[in-house]
Amino acid sequence: MALPDFSMRQLLEAGVHFGHQTHRWNPKMEPFLFGDRNNIHIIDLAQTVPLLHQALVTVRDVVAGGGRVLFVGTKRQASDPVAAAARQCAQYYINHRWLGGMLTNWKTISNSIRRLRQLDEMLAGEAKGLTKKEVLNLTRERDKLERAIGGIKDMGGLPDLIFVIDTNKEEIAIQEARKLGIAVVAILDSNSNPDGIAFPVPGNDDAARAISLYCDLVSRAVIDGISQSQSASGVDVGAEAEPAVEIPAAAEA
C-alpha cells in the first residue's frame, strides 16, 4: 500500500475550489482564498494540495502507530459518505448528531454503548419472554441509540484524531477534541473559522463530489496506515488469503 494520490484536476472537477458567496465569508480564511468570481469566493488550490497531502500523511502516521480515527460529518450531504468511508477502513464515525460530551464525557457515552450492546443481545435472542409491546419499545430504544452512537460502539476509547466535514456545524466536536488534545483534520470552506485546526484543508464542504473525494482519500490513508502497522509487526499483508479491506481505485472525478 501507498499513501493515496490525487491530482489538481480531481480537486477542480469535484468543485473543491468553490467557496461561498462573498458576503458569507469568514475574514480569517482570506489567506486561503485565491479571489472571487461572480460574488463567489475561489479557494486557492495551490495551498489545498500540500495541506491535503500533509493531512493524509498525518492520518496514515496516527493509524500506523496504533491510533484510532473518528470521522465526523452530520450534515445531510456528508452523512452517508462519512459512514461509508469509516466502515471501509474499519474506523469510527458520527454522522447524525454530535451529542455534547461525546468526547469530554466518555464515561457516560460508554454506558450508552453498553446499553446498546445489551439491547442488541436481547433482541438477537428472539426476545424470549417479552411481549410484542416490550419488543417494540426495546427495538425503538436500540434504533435510537444505534443512530446516535452506532458508529463508535466498537471504538473502545477516545480517538487519536478526528476528521471533520464542516467546522461550523461540528464546532462542539472540535472544541471537545481541542480540550482533550486530540488532533483535528478539517475541511475549511470560505465561511469557516480556521482557529485551532491543527491540520486545515481549504476546500468546499458542501458539494457531494468534494465530500466523497475527501472521505475516500482519508479512508485510503487509514488503510495505508493499517498496512504499515501490520508490516511493522511482521504480518505479511500480501500473503493473506483475502485482504482485510477492499480498496476501490481512486475515482477520477
Swiss-Prot record:
One of its GO terms (cellular component) is cytosolic small ribosomal subunit. One of its GO terms (molecular function) is structural constituent of ribosome. Keywords: Ribonucleoprotein, Ribosomal protein. GO terms for biological process: translation. PROSITE patterns: RIBOSOMAL_S2_1, RIBOSOMAL_S2_2. The keyword Heme does not apply. CDD domains: RPS2. Gene3D superfamilies: Glucose-6-phosphate isomerase like protein, domain 1, Helix hairpin bin. InterPro entries: Ribosomal_uS2, Ribosomal_uS2_bac/mit/plastid, Ribosomal_uS2_CS, Ribosomal_uS2_flav_dom_sf. NCBIfam families: rpsB_bact (TIGR01011). Belongs to the universal ribosomal protein uS2 family. This is Small ribosomal subunit protein uS2. It comes from Parvibaculum lavamentivorans (strain DS-1 / DSM 13023 / NCIMB 13966).
